[in-house]
């Protein structure tokens, strides 16, 4: 029996590989000789660097960069030497989790550190970039990142504008004289599932500004500044489009990537599934196991487990899902390729106990064991004509 396991991380508890290896442990208790492939999974958000880097046989590295508040932070990113690819999460350098609640103010938070990570990767030989841009603390339109890469964002006196959205208030000119020359040879794939525009009622300031600490007055100001920033950008890059879907992602970082770096915005799960070649592993599997920390109605909206299920169904494979929490509307997942799903919690516990990594690993392994015991039992008792999921799975295992 061959099982392919691709489970997204249980945020704050288990990484993708930890969750997958725990499920594999449970399966091996029942099928000691099973061939099990544990593959990394992420959707472009938290855990993408580790999942993609390890899934592509790369190495993790760490660099100290300027954090969102202007203070040094340590940022981990991945390098795949064979393809000269860097895998980056902007949240590692400019994420909202790096800013205490009492200090959240998008007028001053910067993406400068994101540019420093890119610059570091370029010096290490990378020319291809995969960047996840979720979880930002910023609303500077990517201005800080561009400054770190050599773009001149200048005020009327020719001085660099200050960090943060506040710098856009005094922005008068954008120059490209000192841009890193290597950038012309670089490609950028941006993992982004946000469709908001740069400005307007559905723009980054209005929609995401409040959670970053913006007041209503700040939102109006930042929206106006970003609009003028886009106008200046269009003078140099005619393709600049502040109305493009995703241009408002990460406080306008999406706009900066598309406009200044010719980046393409793509579904996060699409990038991960392609880069890790998951379909190559699933095509000759007998059963596929996926999951995430919380399985609910939103899972069907482009989340990682559904991406796995869709690939599995291309090859007519049965799909199981394990999750820390399962809501009533998770049944929507059954219509999108997940044949059956199971919560791994065995009793009512506190959130702290449920997320404890030791408990989570044990719960995952124990649940997987019991589910696969049922499958093994059905091998001896079920008729192949039965229409139950378990019999369907057994039938596939016997093929």
What is each model feature region?
Residues 1-133, 137-377:
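N-terminal loops that bind phosphate or other acidic moieties
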Residues 378-399:
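Single conserved hydrophobic/aromatic residue that forms the stacking wall/gate
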